[in-house]
Amino acid sequence: EESLRPLIDRIRTSLDHTAFTYEVVFVDDGSTDGSAAVLEELHASGSNIKVIQFRRNFGKAAAYTAGFAEADGNIIITMDADLQDDPAEIPALVAKLEEGFDLVSGWKQKRHDPLGKTVPSKFFNWVTGRVSGIDIHDFNCGLKAYRSDVTRDVKIYGELHRYIPVLANLEGYRVSEIPVQHHARQFGSTKYGWGRLFKGFLDLLTVMYLGRYMGRPLHLFGALGLVLGGLGLLINGYIATLWLRTG
């Protein structure tokens, strides 16, 4: 809750002097502190501030989905509310979109995170880049810019929010990145670590497997049918042999 007022102040400082018209959509993912009251206060302070409140914690993918559905703009920016992402980067993200890209991810420079987060995160990003073939360095950066077509077409659930660049690329959208500033966490603590890393790799395999066969379902089920059919023939042959031997 401590970061919410400074965050909206930084957003206003970064955007009020630009030609952009904008709104801010906060998604409260079932917070148990005083965030809900602060968000209601912020909502009352400006007509361009919207608030979505979940009754319990549904996770980041659900929060993104709700925020995307509520947003009215042609360009959507996502960022975490812990003040590690810098709203001053928004104009640069939008400028990169205007070069012809559909999704632009931030690439955090000089990260201010403990080794328990940066080491698994770097490993995760390296593996994801190699497996997906997408040449970006920071898939899990919360600071991203999207054309609204991307947020409308890419469906996420579970933990798939970290793979939005991969999913967008599979849909034919152009993905890029720019370096962004990263600030030290002032409030709260990180929950990222090796446990989430392992789960993330399982999700990556799911994304790539489905992406490979999404347009060719018969290739998947045809091959699966051949394997199962072959196993069935072997089992039936074994049973028939036993029956003949025992009479």
Task: Indicate residue ranges for each PLM-predicted region.
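Short, well-formed alpha-helical segments that are part of the catalytic scaffolds
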Residues: E1-L15
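Acidic helix N-cap motif at the loop->helix transition within catalytic regions
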Residues: E2-R5, D33-L42
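Short beta-strand/loop segment that forms part of the nucleotide-sugar
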Residues: R12, F20-S31, I52-Q53
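Short helix-capping segments at alpha-helix termini
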Residues: L15-F20, H43-N48
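A conserved acidic beta->alpha catalytic loop
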Residues: D28-A37, L83-Q84
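Acceptor/aglycone-binding surface of glycosyltransferases and processive sugar-polymer synthases
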Residues: E41, N48-E70, I75, Q84-L170, ...
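Hydrophobic helical membrane-anchoring modules
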Residues: Y163-G247
